Regions:
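Conserved beta-strand edge residues that scaffold enzyme active sites
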Residues: 90, 124-126, 194
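Beta-strand-loop-alpha "switch" segments that mediate conformational coupling across diverse proteins
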Residues: 121
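Surface-exposed, interaction-prone regions with an acidic/low-complexity signature
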Residues: 73-83, 164-183
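Short, solvent-exposed loop/turn segments at secondary-structure junctions
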Residues: 92-96
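N-terminal beta-strand/alpha-helix entry module and adjacent surface
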Residues: 1-79, 100-111, 115-118, 128-155, ...
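A cross-taxonomic marker for long C-terminal extensions/tails that follow the last structured domain
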Residues: 153-171, 192
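Elongated, amphipathic alpha-helical interaction scaffolds
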Residues: 170-205
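Glycine- and acidic-rich phosphate- and metal-coordinating loops
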Residues: 83-91
Length: 205
């Protein structure tokens, strides 16, 4: 689920604290009960380190078990993101890096290597306080980038590459459809030219 951002939140990210602050603001939009449940988000940044989007990729307990790294990269590929942040909340005061958190980050790094998007950090925010942990700040991201544990097998790597190609082609089709729509081209012609559905075309601005 794509999360709406305010103009002030679509800003230049200069530190892990910037991400933690914005994600805490997003978490606080929810009611008290929902805040205590685990959320996993990804944050896409452009090459100038400005936020492009925030996406909620999993919610509930255990949220991280629902995460499929290959699927997560569809939106950053569509948005042309260059950097990806992972963020999740924790309701306990233990802000240490757990083994399942590190495994998720490791897997995301390996898929990112294939599609050309760098996983820059994994940030854990506290649901009740302003405490947070940044893997980048404590040097854990450098350690995980050296890991070979989750390097995809050849067949998996080829599927991931194919997904990246398909998303790039889709982005081109969307650009063409936007131009045709702007020129008031008949929607049936746009559908034939791009392969997009009428519903997809209607959403384009």
């Amino acid at each position: 689920m794509n999360i709406s951002l305010t103009k002030t939140q679509k800003t230049l990210i200069q530190s892990s604290g910037d991400i933690a602050r914005i994600m805490r603001q997003i978490l606080l939009r929810e009611n008290r009960m929902s805040r205590q449940r685990e959320h996993v988000w990804t944050i896409g940044l452009n090459d100038e380190f400005k936020m492009l989007y925030v996406e909620l990729i999993a919610f509930g307990i255990p949220a991280k078990d629902k995460v499929q790294p290959m699927e997560i990269y569809r939106l950053p590929l569509q948005k042309d993101a260059k950097y990806l942040y992972i963020c999740h909340n924790r309701k306990t005061n233990d802000m240490s890096a757990m083994s399942d958190d590190k495994a998720l980050t490791d897997r995301m790094i390996q898929v990112g290597n294939i599609v050309g998007i760098k996983v820059f950090d994994h940030i854990i925010i506290n649901s009740k306080t302003e405490d947070y942990l940044s893997y980048h700040d404590i040097g854990l991201m450098d350690e995980l980038r050296k890991s070979l544990k989750w390097v995809p097998k050849f067949e998996q790597a080829e599927k991931i590459k194919q997904m990246a190609v398909q998303e790039a082609l889709k982005k081109d089709r969307i650009a063409i459809a936007k131009t045709l729509k702007k020129n008031k081209t008949d929607i049936k012609v746009i559908m034939q030219a791009t392969g997009l559905t009428a519903e997809d075309i209607a959403k384009l601005k």
